[in-house]
Amino acid sequence: MFSFNKSEHLCGETQINRLFAEGKAFIVYPVRVVYMFKSEDIPTIKVLVSVPKKKFKRAVARNRLKRLMRESYRLNKTSLLAFCSEKQLSLQIAFCYVGNESADFQTIESKIKIALEKIIQAESK
């Protein structure tokens, strides 16, 4: 339940390009969220985490932010999993860090929680 396996990672250039071209987006600063629902028999959630090299030159800083975003998603994904399995939907999400400064875990976790709730509310309508 609290795992984040390779099968949950969004991979493949075509899938990523389609997500950014056709997906809906919003910002919960410092995270930009792009998501796209598809109706499928087997509901799955695929996640992409991104931190720009332009703003964070050092790989250590980028990797830390990606690790924090992955961890906060992993801990708070249960409501999203329940929603997708109930509605028989597949979901692709991209979390892109847009802040200029590095944030702590509490900040990122609260913003990811808000983002996941927004995704559920948007599709519930």
Where are the regions a protein language model picked out?
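Positively charged, solvent-exposed patches that mediate nucleic-acid binding
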Residues: M1-K125
